[in-house]
Amino acid sequence: AHIVGDECNSAEFFTAGAKIVGLQGPGGKITAAIVEKCLKGFVRGERDPKPKAVSITNATEFGTVYSADDIKAISKLIKPRGLKLHMDGSRFANALTGLGCSPAELTWKAGVDLMSFGATKNGALLLDAVIFFDLQAAEDFAHRRVRAGQQVSKTRFLGSQMAAYLQGGLWLDNARRANALARKLAEGLRQSSVARIAHPVEANMVYAIMPRPLNDRLIASGVKFYPRMANELVGQIKDDEIVVRLVLS
């Protein structure tokens, strides 16, 4: 997840020292059982950090998605313990259209307290939003926004994109197109004899396992993509193979 592996230590910095505990699950998803096992490990009282929230990414870094039932199960576990549920929705539109449910069903109705609503990965420029379903969680957020340097002069010209992004369902149309292209690419790779799919294709990302010589030829021809590995794939990849991430838009 970005909050663990791609943001330097910014989350710890802006929370004045919060500790982030990364959890692993199949396909980049965590389950209620995985969260419960982690919470049971906090047994040393004041010597342990105090759990305050669980953050999930939908769609995940591997292109898999959390269903409404997946989210409800995590919420049902943590809410009695006083924890908040945050959703990293940088690819929320892709998850939503892939599942075919409503935004409400996948967020506040499933127990999400707040979410990062992504737009930059779905056609916008320098535009994301934070949505609070639990208004108590928004306390002091305006101050935190300014302290983080996010109150930039003339931001209204960037923020105006949100109106066009949401109007007429453009954000969903963009995501449907990207998801459809990902499915098409994945099907082509499945039919080939030189590559295979590493994770279920449920959004707009395809993780392909291919021979290194093929990877080198594609890069030489100008194709842009990134190598990406996951602990769960260790042992499944041969020495002459590589895992690459292909993102469609």
Please place each PLM-identified region on the residue numbering.
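PLP-dependent aminotransferase-class I/II
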Residues: 16-61, 66-73
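Active-site C-terminal subdomain of aminotransferase-like
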Residues: 50-60, 65, 98, 102-203
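Conserved C-terminal alpha-helix-loop-beta "cap" of PLP-dependent enzymes
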Residues: 183, 188-249
